[in-house]
Structure formats: C-alpha cells, structure tokens
Curated annotation (Swiss-Prot):
This is Pyridoxine/pyridoxamine 5'-phosphate oxidase. GO terms for molecular function: FMN binding; pyridoxamine phosphate oxidase activity. Pathway: Cofactor metabolism; pyridoxal 5'-phosphate salvage; pyridoxal 5'-phosphate from pyridoxamine 5'-phosphate: step 1/1; Cofactor metabolism; pyridoxal 5'-phosphate salvage; pyridoxal 5'-phosphate from pyridoxine 5'-phosphate: step 1/1. It comes from Saccharopolyspora erythraea (strain ATCC 11635 / DSM 40517 / JCM 4748 / NBRC 13426 / NCIMB 8594 / NRRL 2338). The keyword Thylakoid does not apply. Its EC number is 1.4.3.5. It catalyses: pyridoxamine 5'-phosphate + O2 + H2O = pyridoxal 5'-phosphate + H2O2 + NH4(+); pyridoxine 5'-phosphate + O2 = pyridoxal 5'-phosphate + H2O2. The lineage of its organism: Bacteria, Bacillati, Actinomycetota, Actinomycetes, Pseudonocardiales.
C-alpha cells in the first residue's frame, strides 16, 4: 500500500467519543448567562486538561457574506457582553465595522462543553482599552505597534525590521502608549448557548435568548 493510501484520514468515519462527563438541566442553570459563563469558565480554568480557557473561536463575515473564523483570547465578560482586543485595521475589525455582528465559541473539549455567543458588536471605551493595555507585556505592546495585521508582508524579516524600529522609537519611554489603531470589541449577546455533551448524541443545549430586553431560557434539540 502506498504512503498516500495509508493516510490517517481513512479512519475519520470511525473516530468518535462517547460524551459522559456531565449533564446540564434547567434547574442547575445560573440565573443569567454571564453568571453561568463565569461558573463554567472558572471550572475550565482549573481543569489541567484545558490550556488557555479564555481562547474562543471568533466568527465574522464580510460585506458579501463570506465567513472567516480565528481563535482570539477573551479578556473580559460581564452583563454587557464578551470582550476581546485586536488591531482596528485587521480583517476581523473590517468585518465587524461592516456587518456589526459576530459569534464566538469557547471550545472546552476536555470537559465536553461549548459556549456559543452570538450578537452585535461595539467598540469598548478608550478607558477600558487603556486599562487592559497597561496589563500587556511591553513586548506585546511593541508588537501591536509593529504589525500591520492581516496585510501581506514581504517576509518575517520585514516584520522584525519594523519591530526593531519601534523598539528604538520607544526606547526611552517608560510606558508604551496605546496605538490609535488598536483596541477592544465587545460582543453584545442576543443569545448565549451552553452545550454539554451527553451519551448517544442526545446532548444538553440550553440557550439564554434576549427577547425584547427580557432573557428567556430555552432547550434546543441536539
């Protein structure tokens, strides 16, 4: 058998896991979506099998409806929504400016859980951006100045050359200022779904949905 014919993808149809790690019912659900997210997030943080519990897959679409997804880091959430930070000239930011919608998924696979957030987006305040910026390592701050995110570059050496220039520019600065092209986005949820894997694919799916300002909880078929 040739190497091409022995590809591991031949086993894909038979690859499956039985989900038996837990259950989720209406009676055990917290009173609000953000309280439930905080509960699950805390458990994910303390699960040694989960690395970067705040990683979430962010989905956007451009003006033509062409979708894109990428992993970003959640840097905060509360009753107002879920926050991440990025370059405001990036492809994702361009999508968000055009459509004003986004979806994000926390894939806590080791716990057989997902949380799916869908809604509109808004920029966070300059004060919120400055507060988070101050927490970033200096190297990350300099990198944010140096990277023309999502644009084609001639090679890594070009990025490193730009970074070297930025390092010289701020060499004598005690604090690196926030770039004018950088800041936070908040996903303001219209719905937040909590998914718990169950045996025989009869998964638990409980969704908080904003119904004209009043949140309702609904069970969805798996």
């Amino acid at each position: 058998m040739s190497e091409a014919n022995s590809t591991p993808t031949a086993t894909l149809p038979s690859m499956r896991v039985s989900y038996e790690a837990g259950s989720l019912d209406e009676g055990s659900l917290a009173g609000t979506w953000h309280e439930q997210l905080a509960l699950w997030f805390e458990q994910a943080v303390h699960d040694p099998s989960i690395h970067e519990a705040n990683a979430m897959v962010l989905a956007t679409a451009d003006a033509d409806g062409l979708p894109s997804s990428r992993t970003v880091l959640c840097k905060g959430f509360d009753a107002r929504g879920v926050v991440f930070f990025t370059n405001y000239t990036s492809a994702k930011s361009h999508d968000l400016k055009v459509t004003r919608f986004a979806a994000a998924t926390f894939p806590w696979l080791a716990m057989q859980r997902q949380v799916n957030v869908r809604g509109t987006v808004e920029k966070v305040s300059q004060e919120e951006t400055a507060e988070y910026w101050a927490e970033r390592p200096r190297g990350s701050q300099l990198g944010a100045w140096a990277s023309p995110q999502s644009r084609v570059v001639s090679g890594r050496s070009a990025l490193e050359s730009t970074l070297n220039g930025i390092e010289r520019r701020f060499a004598d600065a005690e604090k690196v200022p926030v770039p004018p092209h950088w800041g936070g986005w908040r996903i303001v949820p219209e719905s937040v779904e909590f998914w718990q894997g169950r045996p025989d694919r009869l998964h638990d799916r409980l969704r908080f949905r904003n119904n004209d300002g009043a949140w309702v909880v609904e069970r969805l078929a798996p």
